[in-house]
Design a protein with these regions (language model features):
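N-terminal secretory signal peptides that target proteins for export/translocation
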Residues: 1-4
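N-terminal cleavable signal peptides for secretion/export
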Residues: 22-106, 124-131
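Short, ordered beta-strand-loop transition motifs
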Residues: 8, 77-83, 140-143
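Short beta-strand micro-motifs enriched in acidic
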Residues: 75-77, 110-114, 139-141
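Bacterial N-terminal signal peptides
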Residues: 6-17
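Coil-to-beta-strand transition motifs
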Residues: 82-84, 115-118, 131, 144
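Solvent-exposed helix/loop surface patches that form functional interfaces
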Residues: 24-32, 39, 47-49, 131-167
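A short, surface-exposed beta-strand/turn
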Residues: 103-117
Length: 167
């Protein structure tokens, strides 16, 4: 059910949206694949402790039903010595729709409270017979920063790689 995955990704992205005036603070010099904004926690459009729950509804032809639920949460914590946020998003089909196509999705993203620099991202996906487990750990403190990526899919198996990351 790719609609559920896309909705969860959209929800996480929306939770991380910054106020428009924060774009003035973006430094594009030396930009790499990861855009890090220089903004303070007070300027953010969200706060730790926020929770959202959704009922996922599907309408197609004669099908008009609630097919699943999604949850998004934002917490504050310390991650490897950094004051950080953890945004979690999960989704699942209802027991009735599990009979047709069972979906279980879990996403988590850790990022610094000041500057919103990514620290870690995880994904645990089960959609019908397809599975994916991904972990991306941002190694900012290395002499040549990189993302340590561990990626598993039921179709391609396990892959580990280092993706270059320029701070």
């Amino acid at each position: 059910m790719p609609v559920l995955r896309h909705m969860l990704i959209l929800l996480c992205t929306c939770m991380l949206a910054l106020p428009m005036h924060a774009q003035e603070n973006v430094d594009f010099k030396g930009t790499s694949c990861v855009l890090v904004r220089t903004t303070t926690e007070e300027e953010l459009a969200f706060r730790a402790g926020e929770r959202m729950e959704f009922i996922l509804h599907y309408k197609w032809g004669s099908i008009n039903a609630d097919v699943g639920t999604a949850k998004v949460a934002l917490d504050s914590l310390t991650f490897n010595g950094h004051e950080a946020f953890r945004c979690t998003a999960s989704g699942r089909t209802t027991k009735l729709f599990d009979l047709f196509f069972k979906v279980r999705e879990e996403f988590a993203s850790w990022f610094t409270r000041e500057g919103m620099r990514p620290l870690k991202f995880t994904r645990d996906t089960h959609e019908g017979g397809y599975e994916a487990r991904n972990t991306y750990l941002y190694r900012w403190d290395e002499p040549e920063p990189y993302i340590a990526a561990d990626v598993y899919t039921s179709k391609l198996g396990q892959t580990s790689m280092q993706l270059p990351l320029t701070p």
